[in-house]
């Protein structure tokens, strides 16, 4: 370890019987290892823990499913709550009301003719339709010259255009086989444009910022915090079409390939008005979603749903799964000048036939033999390059009760008038950016209704504490995700690292859950008398940090610039301090854990809170610790910890947030300031629907009436003073109205992203009594 504590060798015993030199109560000997080794092992252990949670999810799903298989009607009624739950997970937000859909708008101009192409039986138009206020669908419409016998929504992969699936693009006519066949069979066919995987519009031209984020990830980063997602928006567009088609009193089908296949399956699961569904190049079990493009993240998705469960929601309507061609992600390009490379890693796999058959078998077992008759698997013949196998399209036509095909006819294309896909993509992306902007502006109303109104209505301390406890439970379980309480009692290991005339430093590890440990440094002042109990300050490092960073007093060390060795400084003032390791370290190593945990309705802080639960329980067993006076003080990601951990763990008697307090939701979701996380590489940062539930002021309300302080440097680039002041004003007003104005403070200082250690030290002295 390369840091400096002003230590003297452990063998130089100091005079007098002081607690710091005696073995820590109830601990066994901890083997020696470096901080880097301990951290890497802890991250690896938690990764295995998260992987096991994913493996265990399937076996626990039945608790959410109460199926009535006595009849098709009874079955559909029994799964109705699951439809609503799936829609919420996918981002069909209850505040987003679809605009009434009365028809398709034809797009034409002096440049682009009304008819893009025509055949003997149908004509082709560019169209637009409303989905939400300010959010439209656009695509290609193959319209029958006579009355249509059915309507089909044909969804491309995100790497394809509607024109390609309509067979209008020279050299790619084969992609139009399914659309042409359905149109020849008498179907009206609408092919929507999806948000694609290019990055042309992933940035803010007014700020001069461009990123390499796919348009899909670009929208995800703005909307996940607001309870929405790009797939949810696209489902709104599809379901708006379903509403219009269903009113025409003909069968309605949905078919899709790749990303479009995924949307087709989800749409059919959500809307019983879809009569038949074809899913091609999209079936895979959802346990691997953490490896897929970031926008597929769903908080709690696989806790309640696998691919089989989603398919079961389509029954008893026909569902055809085609296994053949699967799309691939485009290869990453070279770095471009002026373009930030901050996209999350991702891949798309081609699942093995055996895995697909296994998933289909499980879906059939879920619904029973009678309903399973409506689920069909089509394996494409070897060498079949069609994205929609001919056999699968045939089964879709049969399910829609479509008659024989007409004889093929020439499709005459007016190539000069095809829509500009790039301009259309810009419109679609900008619409969602603007919708997210509006949602960001109004989400404060939802937080007010959820948190501040109930607290204001609480007229007694008992009612207010009960209200706070209810909100705390919701925050922990629904926003962070709650794991079972740690195993107990805590069994710890420790070793003395070093000592000086003011304190002894112990390294401590303890089991939290099987395979998951908590680890940190305990600094015990040397002046503690037998029987004396001292207050504790838990000193939390930030991103990519180690416990040694907050105890290192060497002013030449890199970490000293931010932390100033504040855990050691406080120990010299007589506080017991503990520097725990939070596992946000290792770049993609810990970020992948976040992706895994999100799938089962958990987050990094689900694990971190468990580690702190166990640490608090262990600290209280030490005879020199005042268990009623354990405070929290964290910088940067440690400041994030200061907002979340004490908010759900009342055993922390106060909290100090340094270098992180913010208009947090805005920092996560806005595209209008360079400091936003949408422009950073920290792709783990977004927390599902937090914008409508708990911003930092609301988290602070969960800490109240315990003391709470903010430490803010004017030059700290994590936020703006104006944002910080706006958010903190709500906190101070709440404390002040409770008659607790002295229990909440903010200190501004001239400085950057660092511990200042002046007003905060006085705050600790005032409330901890030293």
Regions flagged by a language model, labelled:
Residues 149-150, 185-188, 250-251, 272-276, ...:
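Loop/turn elements at helix/coil->beta-strand transitions in domains of secreted/extracellular proteins
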Residues 21-137, 144-147, 224-233, 239, ...:
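Alpha/beta-hydrolase-fold serine-hydrolase catalytic core, especially in secreted/extracellular enzymes
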């Amino acid at each position: 370890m390369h840091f400096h504590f002003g230590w003297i060798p452990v063998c130089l015993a100091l005079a007098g019987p002081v607690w710091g030199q005696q073995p820590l109560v109830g601990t066994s000997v901890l083997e020696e290892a470096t901080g880097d080794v301990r951290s890497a092992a802890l991250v690896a252990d938690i990764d295995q823990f998260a992987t096991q949670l994913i493996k265990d999810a399937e076996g626990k799903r039945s608790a959410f499913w109460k199926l009535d298989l006595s009849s098709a009607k009874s079955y559909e009624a029994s799964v109705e709550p699951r439809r609503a739950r799936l829609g919420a997970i996918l981002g069909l937000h209850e505040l987003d009301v679809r605009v009434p859909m009365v028809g398709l708008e034809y797009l034409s101009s002096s440049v682009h003719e009304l008819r893009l192409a025509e055949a003997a039986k149908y004509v082709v138009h560019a169209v637009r339709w409303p989905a939400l206020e300010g959010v439209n669908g656009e695509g290609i419409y193959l319209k029958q010259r006579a009355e249509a016998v059915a309507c089909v929504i044909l969804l491309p992969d995100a790497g394809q255009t509607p024109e390609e699936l309509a067979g209008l693009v020279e050299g790619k006519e084969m992609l139009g086989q399914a659309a042409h066949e359905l149109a020849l069979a008498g179907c009206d066919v609408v092919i929507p444009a999806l948000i694609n995987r290019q990055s042309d519009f992933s940035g803010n031209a007014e700020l001069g910022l461009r990123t390499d984020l796919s348009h899909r990830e670009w929208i995800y980063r703005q909307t996940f915090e607001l309870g929405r997602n790009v797939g949810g928006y696209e489902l709104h567009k599809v379901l708006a079409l379903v509403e219009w088609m269903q009113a025409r009193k003909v069968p309605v089908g949905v078919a899709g390939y790749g990303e479009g296949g995924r949307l087709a399956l989800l749409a059919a699961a959500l809307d019983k008005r879809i009569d038949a569904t074809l899913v091609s190049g999209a079936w895979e079990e959802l346990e691997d979603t953490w490896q897929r493009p970031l926008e597929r993240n769903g908080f709690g998705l696989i806790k309640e749903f696998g691919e089989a469960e989603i398919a079961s929601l389509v029954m008893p309507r026909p569902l055809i799964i085609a296994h053949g061609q699967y799309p691939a992600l485009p290869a990453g390009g070279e770095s471009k000048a002026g373009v930030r490379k901050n996209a999350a890693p991702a891949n798309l796999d081609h699942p093995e036939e055996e895995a697909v058959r296994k998933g289909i078998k499980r879906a059939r077992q879920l619904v029973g033999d009678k309903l399973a008759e409506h689920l069909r698997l089509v394996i494409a013949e070897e060498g079949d390059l069609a994205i929609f196998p001919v056999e699968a399209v045939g089964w879709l036509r049969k399910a829609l009760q479509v008659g024989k095909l007409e004889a093929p006819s020439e499709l005459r294309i007016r190539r000069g008038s095809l829509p500009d896909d790039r301009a259309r993509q810009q419109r679609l992306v900008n619409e969602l950016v603007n919708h997210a902007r509006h949602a960001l502006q109004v989400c404060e109303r939802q937080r007010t209704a959820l948190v501040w109104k109930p607290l204001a209505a609480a007229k007694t301390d008992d009612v207010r504490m009960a209200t706070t406890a209810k909100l705390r439970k919701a925050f922990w379980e629904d926003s962070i995700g709650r794991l079972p309480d740690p195993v107990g009692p805590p069994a710890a290991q420790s070793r003395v690292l070093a000592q000086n005339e003011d304190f002894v430093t112990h390294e401590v590890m303890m089991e939290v859950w099987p395979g998951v440990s908590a680890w940190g440094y305990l600094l015990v002042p040397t002046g503690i008398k037998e029987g004396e109990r001292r207050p504790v300050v838990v000193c939390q490092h930030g991103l990519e940090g180690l416990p040694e960073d907050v105890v290192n007093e060497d002013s030449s060390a890199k970490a000293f610039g931010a932390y100033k060795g504040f855990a050691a400084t406080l120990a010299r003032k007589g506080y017991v301090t503990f520097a725990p390791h939070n596992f946000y370290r290792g770049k993609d190593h810990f970020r992948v854990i976040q992706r895994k945990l999100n799938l089962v309705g958990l987050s990094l802080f689900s694990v971190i809170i468990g580690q702190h639960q166990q640490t608090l329980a262990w600290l209280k067993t030490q005879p020199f610790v005042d268990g009623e006076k354990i405070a929290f003080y964290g910088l940067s990601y440690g400041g994030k910890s200061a907002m979340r951990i004490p908010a759900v763990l009342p055993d922390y008697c106060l909290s100090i947030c340094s270098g992180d307090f913010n208009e947090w939701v805005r920092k996560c979701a806005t595209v209008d300031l360079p400091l936003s996380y949408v422009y950073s590489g920290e792709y783990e940062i977004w927390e599902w629907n937090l914008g409508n539930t708990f911003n930092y002021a609301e988290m602070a309300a969960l800490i109240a009436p315990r003391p709470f302080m903010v430490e803010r440097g004017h030059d700290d680039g994590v936020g703006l003073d104006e944002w910080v002041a706006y958010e903190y004003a709500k906190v101070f007003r709440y404390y002040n109205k409770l008659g607790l104005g002295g229990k909440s403070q903010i200190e501004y200082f001239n400085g950057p992203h660092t511990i200042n250690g002046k007003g905060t030290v006085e705050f600790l002295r005032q409330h901890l009594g030293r």
